[in-house]
Amino acid sequence: MIKTLLVDDEPLALDMMKSLLREHSDVAIAGAHTSASKALRAIQDLGPDLLFLDIQMPGMSGFDLISKIQAERMPHVVFATAYDSFAVDAFDVHAVDYLLKPIDPSRLAQSLQRVRDQRSAKANTAFDHRDNDRKSHMMTALDGLHGVQPKFLDPKPGN
């Protein structure tokens, strides 16, 4: 499941996004917030996998919110906004995608597939690192055995 958090200052936009995301069985909506500051606390508490984020919000913009998230807690981010002028900035902060409102269901499906692909690649990379760590430990252990002469038990009793 993709644990998802929605952030938009417009309740109607949140409702629309919830409705669209319900069509995707692997997406679990963990929360929806109209305030970026409340969303920041939810990100810290819930650790979502995915964040759908509006850009222009009162008090704190979507970009401001992103800048306050610790790197190790950074979810995948898809910006959902009515303004196309922020697209380059969105990709500068490594957003997975940038959706224009009103959100087209097929574009949303493409965004979710990108998220799935990135999650899969990240999981494979983590597995590769764990596998490499195990190999390294085994090689260190084998190196420690290099030059050790095996001792055999003498089958004759008393020796």
Regions found by a protein language model. Name each.
Residues D26-T34, A42:
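Short hydrophobic/Thr-rich beta-strand motif most characteristic of the beta2 strand and flanking loop
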Residues T4, I29-A30, V77:
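Hydrophobic/aromatic residues located in beta-strands of well-ordered beta-sheets
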Residues V7-D8, H33, L51:
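Conserved sequence signature across two-component system core domains
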Residues L12, R22, S37-R130, R134:
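CheY-like receiver
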Residues M1, M74, V148-Q149:
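A structure-centric signal for secondary-structure junctions around beta-strands
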Residues M1-L12, M17, L21:
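Conserved acidic segment of CheY-like receiver
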Residues R116-N159:
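Conserved binding/recognition cores within well-folded domains
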